[in-house]
Design a protein with these regions (language model features):
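Flavin-dependent oxidoreductase catalytic cores
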Residues: 1-332
Length: 332
């Protein structure tokens, strides 16, 4: 059996999201949620082996605990990539068995692997043997016509027997044809009862629930049935919710920070990035939702969106955007 992360570090996590959870996003999320486990975007095993590792794997020390999510279906390649990821300092290596996109299917990885539990088990066994870091799996309830809990349970049992002790379960199945990745996050019905049943029947496994968890109450109440929750789009589009979830789960006696306080704590990182030549637009895109639903929220987004493409834009742009929200708050 692979090592398991410390239980308190898997109670709350932020999902791996392609094109979103890059290193700039993860540092921002760490400021919002000091106790959450963060995940990289999915990286194909071959890219880890052959690609620019600093670009693909580099992360800031503040991100710990942080997991590297791998895609692939070749056990030898996944083993090599897992070892590389562990050597880079990642706290967990996660195998993606949940992404339903056409591109991913064409490469024979992601959700389509739920049809091949023995292959997934072979991949996991190779990864566990190669990696000193814990190896975990993120999966769905099934794909296409799979409608039977027993098939899902058999998949989990097969992969667990290869050494995986933690499963992040997106509580929907995926349709491999006919639905876009976005539709696959929304149209297939949520079946939390399957995930709850899995935890009851396999109490030896660490089970993290993913899918449809958008509020503090949703997330906290889910912990009565599973070991942890993983938040996806809600954490990105309305990041202040992530801060409130972290507070509610870990430090309920502490008042949440104000949005402006949280953003100003990001300043040293932003200025360090600018000093290294990183364009501010790569950073500001991750903070656009911080004032969602608040006075001045639309103006905040507008100031950032209009100013970020300028090559000389820096922290002063973010301060100008903050000033707009503070004026609106005073007026209210």
């Amino acid at each position: 059996m692979s090592l398991l992360p410390a239980p308190e570090t898997t109670r709350l996590s932020v999902a791996p999201m392609m094109d979103w959870t890059d290193r700039h996003c993860r540092v921002f999320h760490r400021l919002l949620a000091p106790h959450a486990r963060l995940y990289t975007e999915m990286v194909h095993a071959q890219a880890v082996i052959l690609g620019d590792r600093d670009r693909l794997l580099g992360f800031d020390a503040v991100e710990h605990p942080v997991a590297l999510q791998l895609g692939g279906s070749d056990p030898a390649h996944l083993a090599q990539a897992s070892r590389i990821g562990a050597d880079w300092g990642y706290d967990e290596i996660n195998l993606n068995v949940g992404c339903p996109s056409d591109r991913v299917q064409a490469g024979r990885f992601g959700a389509c692997l739920m049809r091949e539990p023995s292959l997934v088990a072979e991949c996991v066994a190779a990864m566990v043997a190669a990696s000193p870091a814990p190896v975990t799996v993120k999966c769905r309830l099934g794909v296409d016509e799979m409608e039977d809990y027993g098939v899902f349970r058999a998949f989990i049992d097969t992969v667990a027997s290869a050494g995986c002790g933690l499963f992040v379960v997106h509580a929907r199945k995926a349709w491999l044809q006919g639905l876009s990745p976005k539709e696959n996050r929304e149209i297939p019905p949520l079946r939390y009862d399957w995930v709850h049943q899995l935890k009851r029947e396999r109490p030896d496994l660490r089970i993290v629930l993913n899918g449809g968890l958008a509020t503090v109450d949703d997330s906290v109440s889910a912990l009565a049935h599973v070991d942890g929750v993983m938040i996806g789009r809600a954490a990105y589009h309305e990041p202040y919710r992530l801060h409130l979830m972290d507070r509610a789960m870990f430090t309920p006696g502490l008042a949440p920070w104000e949005r402006g306080q949280l953003l100003r704590a990001y300043r040293p990182y932003v200025e360090d990035c600018r000093a290294r030549g990183v364009a501010v637009k790569h950073i500001t895109r991750h903070i656009l939702g911080l004032f969602h639903g608040q006075p001045g929220g639309r103006a905040f987004r507008q100031v950032l969106s209009e100013g970020a493409p300028r090559s000389d834009a820096g922290w002063d742009l973010i301060e100008r955007a903050l000033a707009v929200t503070e004026r609106r708050e005073d007026a209210a």
